[in-house]
UniProtKB/Swiss-Prot annotation:
GO terms for molecular function: calcium ion binding. Residues 721-1134 are cytoplasmic. The lineage of its organism: Eukaryota, Metazoa, Chordata, Craniata, Vertebrata. The chain crosses the membrane at residues 700-720. It holds the Pfam family Cadherin. It comes from Mus musculus. Residues 1-27 form the signal peptide. This is Protocadherin 18. Residues 892-1134 are annotated as: Interaction with DAB1.
Amino acid sequence: MHQMNTKMHFRFALALLMAFFSHDVLAKNLKYRIYEEQRVGSVIARLSEDVADVLLKLPNPSAVRFRAMPRGNSPLLVVNENTGEISIGAKIDREQLCQKNLNCSIEFDVLTLPTEHLQLFHIEVDVLDINDNSPQFSRPVIPIEISESAAVGTRIPLDSAFDPDVGENSLHTYSLSANDYFNIEVRTRTDGAKYAELIVVKELDRELKASYELQLTASDMGVPQRSGSSILKISISDSNDNSPAFEQPSYTIQLLENSPVGTLLLDLNATDPDEGANGRIVYSFSSHVSPKIIETFKIDSEKGHLTLFKPVDYEITKSYEIDVQAQDLGPNSIPAHCKIIIKVVDVNDNKPEISINLMSPGKEEVSYVFEGDPIDTFVAIVRVQDKDSGLNGEIICKLHGHGHFKLQKTYENNYLILTNATLDREKRSEYSLTVIAEDKGTPSLSSVRHFTVQINDINDNPPRFQRSRYEFVISENNSPGAYITTVTATDPDLGENGHVTYTILESFVLGSSITTYVTIDPSNGAIYALRIFDHEEVSQITFVVEARDGGSQKQLSSNTTVVLTIIDENDNVPVVIGPAMHNNTAEISIPKGAESGFHVTRIRVVDRDSGANAEFSCSIVSGNEENIFIMDPRSCDIHTNVSMESIPSAEWALSVIIQDKGSPPLHTKVLLRCMVFDYAESVTSTAMTSVSRASLDVSMIIIISLGAICAVLLVIMVLFATRCNREKKDTRSYNCRVAESTYQHHPKRPSRQIHKGDITLVPTINGTLPIRSHHRSSPSSSPTLERGQMGSRQSHNSHQSLNSLVTISSNHVPENFSLELTHATPAVEVSQLLSMLHQGQYQPRPSFRGNKYSRSYRYALQDMDKFSLKDSGRGDSEAGDSDYDLGRDSPIDRLLGEGFSDLFLTDGRIPAAMRLCTEECRVLGHSDQCWMPPLPSPSSDYRSNMFIPGEEFPAQPQQQHSHQGLDDDSQPAENGEKKKSFSTFGKDSPSDEDSGDSSTSSLLSEMSSVFQRLLPASLDTFSECNEGDRSNSLERRKGPAQGKTGGYPQGVAAWAASTHFQNPTSSSGTPLGTHSSVQPSSKWLPAMEEIPENYEEDDFDNVLNHLSDGKHELMDASELVAEINKLLQDVRQS
């Protein structure tokens, strides 16, 4: 039993490979065997393993999928598309599937996907029988009647048992229970069925035993063996004299399968010698005849005619075996038996059958193929068969319809329909194909099958515009949202592949996005305006419209260019731009001597429209009744028609209309007031009549004049702003931190007195201030001047011009006094100015520039931007950013060009006047006592007000008029030498009183205020523009001696003196100034020229000692005054 179960669940997988190669399609037969009644889901085969040799030849074997092409019984087996596993999908019953056929199989086809590399596998699964059925009789009791006179050996056919199994599992034999009178013999019919015949083996005697009951058993040979039984109930009757007899015990008949119903097959004839009822014979089928025979054939009980009651089919049943009996009507009648064998003859009565297997999820008669698929793409599987045999069953298959498809045979009567060309759905979307199958019988029979191939769309066509460029026009002054036009693109693809969406690609028109000008409806391509168009602003708009389809895999697009021309409308009136108009009125001057044809003026007109809308004509509509003037309508030139000398009138009011040629026309009306005036010299008629001579237009003169006035006003505003900024700084709170920085605010003037110490001598050589080395590292490195070196310097620099800069403090300029040195300034004697000062004809006014105790004498470049009225636009002040441009002719440019950049730098040292600041200054601000030094009383010795470079500010001197103060101020120097001062000018200061010193000191004190009044105060605020010199100057400010604070005094006086005495040159050797011819004639210069170039502030005593060694004479006051007058004259000349 266990072996039986094992055999039932055994999967017999024998693959018989039959490969047919045709082009690129491989057909391969695979056969498997399974037993019926296996569990659902049992795996039969794995195609991925069984056809691995074929799959390895494909480009991508791992991506291959399997698709089963179903037939009628296909639901019994299923195929996994990914793995190719064939498994049982439903219960398989061989007896139900194939009945008694010995060969039972399930056939279907499997394709590989994708179809570009199609492989076809034909699968045949043979279903093997298991012994799951027992033989059965149709009747549990079989009655049999036998005459007691029946001879030994008499045969009586018995009912057959039925076993649906086949082979060894089917009915094999019969057996009869043990007895002495009867036996059985097993016989086989022509169809292979087995039946038993009952044989009388011993004479019967009804008087001994009238009936018998025997068991008839039918058995198979299956494992386990199965059997079925029935009871034979035999009755023994009295004997009858004669029984009917057939002419033959058996008959064989040939029956054409196409024989019609009612055909007489056999006329049975049985004879009985008896008479009367005993001689009348009745014909009938034997009791054990199968129901199928009774349904197919019919026998006439009286005549014995066997006829066809139902059509037979050779393909279903090839033969029939019929048992017929004849029995008389007498009592105890014994029937006679006859066997009739009917063989069905095959004829060509079956047309070929065509089955088309399409890979269609829906309709059975429609196959779908994607356009663009390569040649030999799978379309359908065709299977043809003919139930006839021989030539009647041989079939010829053909494909009709279109040359784009072909029929390719794979095995037996199976075919493939493949594409024979690349298909294009846009050219043809559907094909009707016809399969014709014809057998070789006579006459030949054929079948026809139609099906449809529909081409699936792919997104292989981009949207296409009718034109690559569209040009449209629209009038200006349109309303926003106005419809412009529609651009349409067509896409022959289907569905989303053909759904077109329109967009405008991003571009810019006059700096604005195109989407602010026009928009497009994405569904239909309608273009609308988004704004009011102005032809004068933009006359043409060009943009690109993109049409894109909605393909899912990829989207295709195409572009077209749209040119939108904006048509001009006459919406602008002519505008007169010349001559200059005021309230549409212009004044025209005409010389008295103007002859006929004199060009009075030309009206210049501008019309922003274009074309005819911009064309205009001019005409005089009134004021010219006497035809004194003529006007060219095209050029709008006005000429005199008569001589002005002959016209008594001196003024005309001409009304002129300028009208364009638009529709409707627009015009402008102006009034020209023409006035006649006399020239000092009459204009010649030739010059008047010459139209070609260019004359300066009045309007151009006005424009130039306005420009010049604006420029002058701008300069005045800049100067005014500079002065205001400086005065505003005076109101700010003072801060010691700021005072220590590079820029110091101008404090309030502490004193109105004039100090002779306001004159400071600053020696220069060749127009260049002494420059300290940038790389001085220690005080010891400071150069010193030896007398021996001075002599060599004097000979080497014989052509150098040593100038003395006299810096005069501007503390004492009176409020009502202002003097600027120009070329037009008349000569002013110093003695006159001194006399005015002493006589009190003017009063000094306060100056906010401070005195020598409160000023640092330098203005830092980094603070000069505070006075600037310009902004770089970058948020920060930059080098060179000031109110004066380097290219302009300003005093600061001349000063820079002459080498005085160092005068405007500061060293950041705290002046002595600021040492009174306390910690409260940092918190509460500074008071006047903080920044105002104690003022000295007027001293006869100028040294008390003298600033010597390199020296610290002296302490507050006591007010005295004796010359002892001069001696007190003069302290020994570090070298042990006596301090030299300006009074000595090369000589030692005497210890006794000197009237000459007193007069000289008084004179210098008064000259201080004179120079302050002679020079412009605004020049004191100029700053450098060279950022590089700033850092250089800061390096040079470091003093060589400990505890000393020095710096170069600077100011406008230094600039004036420099301008007078120097003639600087540029790097190219070209003089920078305009006074190169002025040669200084001062008696000071021979002595000052001996000062070396490397002069330092701390070497001032050495200079004086050197000068004293030269034994220079001291000039008196009158000479000094004359020299100063000479200085003033040279300054004015330069």
